[in-house]
Amino acid sequence: MRVKINLKCSSCGSKNYLTSKNKSNHPDKIEVPKYCPKERKVTLHIES
């Protein structure tokens, strides 16, 4: 079952991206390096 998740910037805390994941295949939280427009650089985004 796929669920929608938000990716939150680890440094500024803003929710920048919306994505989906399969909870049965990936039960742990996702951590992805993505571009943060607020800080204008690539930061680690964590599932929230």
Swiss-Prot record:
Alphabetized InterPro entries for the sequence: Ribosomal_bL33 (IPR001705), Ribosomal_bL33_CS (IPR018264), Ribosomal_bL33_sf (IPR038584), Ribosomal_zn-bd (IPR011332)
Domain of life where this protein originates: Bacteria
Signal peptide: none
GO biological process, one term: translation
Entry's transmembrane regions: none
Cellular component per GO, a single term: ribosome
Single Gene Ontology MF annotation: structural constituent of ribosome
Keywords: Ribonucleoprotein, Ribosomal protein
HAMAP family per UniProt: Ribosomal_bL33
Family: Belongs to the bacterial ribosomal protein bL33 family.
The protein's name: Large ribosomal subunit protein bL33A
Organism: Streptococcus agalactiae serotype V (strain ATCC BAA-611 / 2603 V/R)
